[in-house]
Structures are given as structure tokens and as C-alpha cells.
Amino acid sequence: PGTSDAMDLAKMLAAQELIAPLRDGQFNIWTQTRIGLLSHPLDDQSARGHLAASTYLQMALRPDIYHIVGHTEADHAATADDIIEAVKITRRAIQNALGAPDMRQAPEVQTRKEELVAETRVLLDAIRELAPSDVADPWADPATLARSVTLGLMDAPQLRNNKFGR
């Protein structure tokens, strides 16, 4: 089991909202979406349906770039024929999504997005408070980030057995 489509959309809308203030004349934000390889079913027919449904959902994020992950890639490296088929499935899903009702406005999506934004702001404030006063950017400071992990503000299970992750 994974995240529901509505909650996955809320999560990514929260991420978009949180990074939007970074956009200025010197910094652009380009949104690229793709399906997670591990989310693809191994069954070929199910994988085709998953590719279409996931593409349709991702269009709610209005990506600048859509990265196609072929429906066969959970089973084997995509062949030329697999890629052509995946492109056809994806193209149709995108065409269907254009002009569709705006899933971003669903009340449950908006409610969860706002919860995630608020929780993330609390976390970012807590990380900022950990930094010494002479640190210009606490969110890019290795010592501050390491401290946030060791104090349990952020998870980093992949560092458990890494001497630098302590």
C-alpha cells in the first residue's frame, strides 16, 4: 500500500507551494514529473493502466516536463516497441487530462496540502533555530543539517550504519 492519489497530489502541491518563493529573476523552477519505477505492477495489462492513470494524475501538477517511465520497466528494460507503446498511452492520458476538472481544488487535497505546508514550516523554523547565528543559510549548512538528523528532526535511516551520519 502506498499514498492515495489525492494525498500524493496534496504532497506535491505542498512542495510546489514551499519552493515557489525561490522563483525570481535569477532562479527558475521547472517541474518534471515521472512515475516511480517501484510503483509499476509487474502484470503487463495492469502496468499499462497504471501508466495511463498516473500520467493523468501528474497533469494536475502542470509539469513543464513529463518523463515517461515505460510500463514494462518493472519487468525488463524497455525495447523500442515498448517505448512507442508507452508514448502512445501517455499521449492519450495527457490529452484526456487537458481541460479536465481541476483535481487540485478538491477539498481533501487542499486541506492536506495546507497541513503539510504548516508542518513543513514548523520543521524549517526548527532547523533554522539550530544554526549558529553566523550561518547565513541553515538549510544548506552541513553541520546544522547533521544536527537536525541527530536530534531526530529529520529522518535519515540510510545513514544508520554510516560513520558520517552520526
Task: Describe the role of every protein-language-model region.
Residues 1-91, 95:
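Helix-rich catalytic cores of soluble enzyme domains
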Residues 63-78, 83, 87-166:
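Acidic, glycine-enriched catalytic cores built around paired aspartates
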